[in-house]
Structures are given as structure tokens and as C-alpha cells.
Curated annotation (Swiss-Prot):
<keyword id="KW-0832">Ubl conjugation</keyword>
<feature type="modified residue" description="N6-acetyllysine">
    <location>
        <position position="37"/>
    </location>
</feature>
<comment type="function">
    <text>Core component of nucleosome. Nucleosomes wrap and compact DNA into chromatin, limiting DNA accessibility to the cellular machineries which require DNA as a template. Histones thereby play a central role in transcription regulation, DNA repair, DNA replication and chromosomal stability. DNA accessibility is regulated via a complex set of post-translational modifications of histones, also called histone code, and nucleosome remodeling.</text>
</comment>
<dbReference type="InterPro" id="IPR000558">
    <property type="entry name" value="Histone_H2B"/>
</dbReference>
<dbReference type="InterPro" id="IPR055333">
    <property type="entry name" value="HISTONE_H2B_site"/>
</dbReference>
<dbReference type="GO" id="GO:0003677">
    <property type="term" value="F:DNA binding"/>
</dbReference>
<protein>
    <recommendedName>
        <fullName>Histone H2B.5</fullName>
    </recommendedName>
</protein>
<comment type="similarity">
    <text>Belongs to the histone H2B family.</text>
</comment>
<dbReference type="GO" id="GO:0030527">
    <property type="term" value="F:structural constituent of chromatin"/>
</dbReference>
<feature type="compositionally biased region" description="Basic and acidic residues">
    <location>
        <begin position="36"/>
        <end position="54"/>
    </location>
</feature>
<dbReference type="Pfam" id="PF00125">
    <property type="entry name" value="Histone"/>
</dbReference>
<keyword id="KW-0544">Nucleosome core</keyword>
<dbReference type="GO" id="GO:0046982">
    <property type="term" value="F:protein heterodimerization activity"/>
</dbReference>
<feature type="cross-link" description="Glycyl lysine isopeptide (Lys-Gly) (interchain with G-Cter in ubiquitin)">
    <location>
        <position position="151"/>
    </location>
</feature>
<keyword id="KW-0238">DNA-binding</keyword>
<feature type="region of interest" description="Disordered">
    <location>
        <begin position="1"/>
        <end position="63"/>
    </location>
</feature>
<feature type="compositionally biased region" description="Basic and acidic residues">
    <location>
        <begin position="1"/>
        <end position="28"/>
    </location>
</feature>
Length: 155
């Protein structure tokens, strides 16, 4: 909401004295104060602390969006240190990983339900990888997953 314009006092009475701080802020009686330049609503300076606010007047917390972008970049640098990736390609890779994750999680949940187990273990994940991914890709994924689990449990 935009701040309301200040009202000028109608007529000053001689008996009334204002503090020195207030006198310094006000413009001389004969001149109009210059209009301040305002930025569009919600676009304050970076360090000003002004931002979007909710109905109660509190500052809205920025929603964190979790992505795999940093991990994709780390793997890319391990495999091809001299090659970069565009933001569009990074977005596609992030969507791809989210899609595979959802497929594996759904399949693992089905397997746990079929076996009447309340917990998804590494066994359900391994079976879902074999069911979702094709041939050689599934074999490599299972071996890498097994290696990661043994490294995690031994550490």
C-alpha cells in the first residue's frame, strides 16, 4: 500500500513552537516540496529491506526451490572438465532427474504395498530400478547404487 501524502498545517499560531528537528525537515512556507522519486511497488533497493509483504504486514519468506543443478554441474566437471552447460540444458537435466526419481519412488511404493511392508528399503529401490530402467542401464545403475550404499554404511 502506498504511503499517504503529508498534510500541511493550515495556519501557524505564534504561541505554538515546533522542535528544531521538525523545522529542519519541512520546506519553507512559500515553496512546494519536491516530489520524491518512487520505485514501483515491491522493487526497493537491494539492501533497503523493503520487499513483498503479506496481509499482516510481515515480510514474506522466499520459498526455496530445491534442484539438482549443483550436482549435475559437479558430475559434468568430473566427466568433462572443459565443457560448460547452458541454463536451458541444465533445466532439462533437472526435469529429467525429477522424472526418473518420481518413477522410481512410485514403483518402489507399489512394491512395498504388494509385499505389505510399511518401509521402502534399498531392496525395493533396487527392484524398481530393474523394472523402470532398460537393460544395460539398469545393470550399471544397480552396481553404482550398491557401491554407494556400501560406502555409506562403512563410513
Amino acid at each position: 500500500m502506498a504511503p499517504k501524502a503529508e498534510k500541511k498545517p493550515a495556519a501557524k499560531k505564534p504561541a505554538e513552537e515546533e522542535p528544531a528537528a521538525e523545522k529542519a525537515e519541512k520546506a519553507p512556507a512559500g515553496k512546494k516540496p519536491k516530489a520524491e522519486k518512487r520505485l514501483p511497488a515491491g522493487k526497493g533497493e537491494k539492501g533497503s529491506g523493503e520487499g513483498k509483504k503479506d496481509r499482516a504486514g510481515r515480510k514474506k519468506a522466499k520459498k526455496s526451490v530445491e534442484t539438482y543443478k549443483i550436482y549435475i554441474f559437479k558430475v559434468l566437471k568430473q566427466v568433462h572438465p572443459d565443457i560448460g552447460i547452458s541454463s536451458k540444458a541444465m533445466s532439462i537435466m533437472n526435469s529429467f532427474i525429477n522424472d526418473i526419481f518420481e518413477k522410481l519412488a512410485a514403483e518402489a511404493a507399489k512394491l512395498a504395498r504388494y509385499n505389505k511392508k510399511p518401509t521402502i528399503t534399498s531392496r525395493e529401490i533396487q527392484t524398481s530400478v530393474r523394472l523402470v530402467l532398460p537393460g544395460e542401464l539398469a545393470k550399471h545403475a544397480v552396481s553404482e547404487g550398491t557401491k554407494a550404499v556400501t560406502k555409506f554404511t562403512s563410513a
